Design a protein with these regions (language model features):
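A short acidic, Gly/Pro-enriched loop at the edge of an enzyme's catalytic core
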Residues: 153-165
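Class I SAM-dependent methyltransferase SAM/SAH-binding core
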Residues: 99, 107-154
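Conserved class I S-adenosyl-L-methionine
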Residues: 94-104
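N-terminal auxiliary segments of SAM/dcSAM-dependent transferases
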Residues: 1-50
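C-terminal alpha-helical "lid/dimerization" subdomain adjacent to the S-adenosyl-L-methionine
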Residues: 197-253
Length: 262
């Protein structure tokens, strides 16, 4: 009932300085089209109406409810936690260009511009409805970020063009084959001295069997077909296959920035 109004608001002129570039010819990966992710009809990429923003609006509220508010009032805790981790472990790191892969509604994209105001912040996603909503949302917050509809397996950015490449719970939403391609793209796009961080829920090896079993419920009951395997990835092996030095790969448990700030 609210969709027409939401579309109209999202299309209204904005002035924060961010951009939105859509590609109607982009082929949506089969790992999106073959299953309704999170049991949402049509997943997040399907266009229900012209200039659709429904998927973004639903996700914005839905993820808050799903996480029971633990991602913070702006749903940005994952991005905030990466930033806090970087400030603690690499205090002198000051990225000038930042790329968020699978940015969805840009919840975790926005904090990078707030914390690194001199940086150019870009986000990519395959889902146009999510990107339209993300653009309208970030502009309404007065935060200029640059969003484009691209597959993270093959992007149009120049080699070595980003100092920081991040993703926020993207890995368990993509296939193993796609993740290998994404890692190779990260290697191509990363500037010398740059950092790649893929933030995910804890690996199964970091929890007891019961907790792993409970979390694995999502694989079969929340249309998360890649959940199980993604939580068994070996970072050094994935880094080496993509062309990175495995000795420089790392795996860390970063505390919640939202919880720490309470």
């Amino acid at each position: 009932r609210q969709l027409d109004k939401l579309v109209s608001v999202a299309k209204a002129p904005t002035s924060a300085g961010g951009t939105l570039t859509l590609n109607p010819d982009l082929e949506i990966p089969r790992y999106h089209t073959a299953v309704d992710i999170h049991c949402q009809p049509g997943g997040y990429h399907t266009e229900m109406v012209k200039d659709d923003v429904a998927a973004g609006a639903i996700y914005d509220r839905g993820v808050y409810i799903y996480a029971m508010g633990q991602l913070g009032p702006m749903n940005d805790d994952i991005g905030g936690s990466i930033i806090a981790y970087l400030k603690e472990t690499r205090a002198d790191f000051a990225p000038k260009r930042i790329l968020d892969l699978g940015c969805s509604a840009a919840h975790s994209t926005v904090p990078y511009k707030l914390h690194y105001p001199d940086a150019e912040v870009c986000g990519v996603d395959v889902a146009a409805p999510m990107l339209r909503y993300a653009h309208a949302r970030s502009e309404s917050l007065g935060v200029p970020i640059h969003l484009s509809q691209q597959n993270a397996e093959d992007m149009n950015f120049e080699d070595g063009s980003f100092d920081l490449i991040v993703s926020h719970i993207l890995v368990h939403e993509t296939s193993s084959a796609a993740f290998r391609k994404i890692m190779k793209e990260c290697h191509r796009l990363l500037a010398p001295g740059g950092i790649v961080i893929h933030a995910e829920t804890p690996a199964y090896k970091a929890m007891d069997d019961f907790d792993a079993f409970i979390l694995d419920w999502d694989t079969y009951n929340n249309n998360e077909p890649f959940w199980s395997k993604s939580h068994e990835i070996d970072p050094p092996s994935a880094a080496k296959e993509a062309g990175f030095d495995p000795a420089k790969s790392f795996e860390a448990m970063a505390p919640s920035a939202y919880e720490a700030a309470k």
